Amino acid sequence: MSISVTCCGTGTPIVVLHGWGMNSNIWQPVVPALSEHFQLYCVDLPGFGDSVWSSENDVSLESFIEQIMPALPPRFHLLGWSLGGLIATQIALTHSDRVMSLTTVASSPHFVESNDWAGIKPDILEQFQQQLDSNFKKTIERFLAIQAMGSEDAREQVKQVKQLIFTKPMPDQGVLKQSLTILQTADLRQQLPNIEVPFNRFYGRLDSLVPERAIDDISALAPESKAVVFTKSAHAPFISEPERFISELLKVVEN
């Protein structure tokens, strides 16, 4: 199997998907506590961490999912952060028979800002695309800095995340570029009403990538879903507020 999945703990299965440029080590701050309650499946997305990109297809939400699904248990709760939340949303739409609940973290059905939609400014993602050609490790580090921006311990958080993710292999450069294109172009807004499983959305109040003002717009598209805002967090609430994160996730699964 070309997909790396680290499994730990016992109990109800929960699959966790990381974000762009990262790998499954990003979840380490909450793994010990979560594995006391769940059987945790920490996935390296294809082309990231220890997972190789093995599809002959271009990088897309569908080709990510096609490679991930055979490595997952028959039924599971699904937790996706940032780009991982976008992939998780697509899984919930296309494999609802296997998904017990969907929780997205600092994620959006459409990441890019436009006149009537709050998101990442298009020129920021365009700069990342250009910088990837010259120095992709530095580009990931810059992305980390933007993710942490606004949180009280931003500098410490960036340092912690670097230590976590750089212990695994660097991402495949082609997958890195093409998955950034997914962030630039994917739009699942019109499909959100079709999500049939319990749907919870976690946000950081200080997040500059998925701004707080986007929350109500997403709620309007998915009125059955529930939004939880972490007041002291930017883009990574599970790092900034791990205890509350675990508590909120336990509520999701217990319900």
UniProtKB/Swiss-Prot annotation:
Substrate binds at W20, S82, L83, F143, L144, A145, I146, Q147, H235. Monomer. Its EC number is 3.1.1.85. This is Pimeloyl-[acyl-carrier protein] methyl ester esterase. The active site is at S82 (nucleophile), D207, H235. Its main location: cytoplasm. HAMAP family: Carboxylester. It is found in: Cytoplasm. Residues 13-242 form the AB hydrolase-1 domain. GO terms for cellular component: cytoplasm; membrane. Pathway: Cofactor biosynthesis; biotin biosynthesis. PANTHER family: AB HYDROLASE SUPERFAMILY PROTEIN YCLE, MONOACYLGLYCEROL LIPASE. It catalyses: 6-carboxyhexanoyl-[ACP] methyl ester + H2O = 6-carboxyhexanoyl-[ACP] + methanol + H(+). It comes from the Bacteria. Belongs to the AB hydrolase superfamily. Carboxylesterase BioH family. Pfam families: Abhydrolase_1. Gene3D superfamilies: alpha/beta hydrolase. Keywords: Biotin biosynthesis, Cytoplasm, Hydrolase, Serine esterase. GO terms for biological process: biotin biosynthetic process. The physiological role of BioH is to remove the methyl group introduced by BioC when the pimeloyl moiety is complete. It allows to synthesize pimeloyl-ACP via the fatty acid synthetic pathway through the hydrolysis of the ester bonds of pimeloyl-ACP esters. The gene is bioH. One of its GO terms (molecular function) is pimelyl-[acyl-carrier protein] methyl ester esterase activity.
